[in-house]
Design a protein with these regions (language model features):
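Cell-envelope and extracellular/periplasmic
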Residues: 80-82, 104-119, 129, 133, ...
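Charged helix-capping and loop-helix junction motifs
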Residues: 121-129, 161-166
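Generic structural signal for well-ordered alpha-helices
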Residues: 93, 128-133, 166, 170
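A short helix->loop->beta-strand "cap" motif at the edges of active sites that frequently abuts
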Residues: 139-143
Length: 228
């Protein structure tokens, strides 16, 4: 019995002394470094004026090529990077949000989080709140608007989770300070309650010009209401 105890003690000491492997990060920020540096180079070449409207998020923001033309008279800045999740956008807040001191952030992200299986709707909604806290630490007066998860054929099987994300963010926005919810979901559905035909690219995931025309209308209505 004495030998067994000594063996157990020695084994415990060896385990305690052994190096412990760190948990792998939940995502690879290095994959976005080229995108972020491209933004920074553009900023050095043409420094944006503070107080504008920053559009941030994933590929649906990045691919909005007509953004400036869609909202004439508004100083808009596009800092979307494709495939990103909310936690990744949050990690880059010091580099692609805070330097611009925006008066308003229009944010679209969260669908990749759910589609990848890495986050539930509840977790993605919590991640958005973390994004807000990250911004508000330095920019307490900045208003932030969340564009709802959009329906599309490629991820229609995930619609319940997407709608749950929308519900959670909408509910929070009703009581949170200067947090708004822009609901594009209904406008993107056809008469049968499924995603409209003809507003998506061949991948049935990303929008074409007709899809962005819907966003232009819905987001434009929101921006006009802010001026009232």
């Amino acid at each position: 019995m004495r030998l067994t105890r000594r063996s157990l003690l020695l084994g415990s000491l060896l385990l305690a002394a052994a190096p412990v492997a760190a948990d792998p990060p939940p995502f690879n920020l290095a994959q976005w470094e080229a995108d972020i540096r491209a933004f920074e180079e553009a900023d050095r070449a043409h420094p944006p004026q503070p107080g504008g409207v920053l559009f941030a998020g994933s590929s649906s923001i990045r691919l909005w090529a007509t953004l400036a033309d869609d909202f004439p008279g508004i100083r808009v800045l596009n800092r979307g990077f494709g495939g990103s999740q909310i936690r990744e956008v949050t990690a880059f807040v010091p580099r692609i949000v805070l330097p611009y001191k925006p008066s308003l952030i229009v944010f679209y992200c969260g669908t990749n989080d759910i589609a990848s299986g890495s986050r539930t709707a509840a977790q993605a909604a919590d991640d958005f709140q973390s994004f807000v806290r990250s911004v508000r630490t330095s920019l307490p007066e900045t208003r932030i608007a969340f564009i709802s998860a959009a329906p599309n054929p490629a991820r229609w099987h995930l619609r319940a989770e997407m709608q749950e994300l929308n519900r959670r963010v909408r509910d929070w926005s009703r009581t949170a300070d200067r947090i708004d919810f822009i609901d594009v979901w209904p406008a993107m559905l056809g008469p049968g309650g499924e995603p409209k035909a003809g507003i998506y690219r061949e991948d049935n995931l990303h929008m074409n010009a007709a899809g962005y025309a819907i966003w232009k209308q819905v987001v434009g209505d929101y921006l006009r209401d802010l001026k009232k």
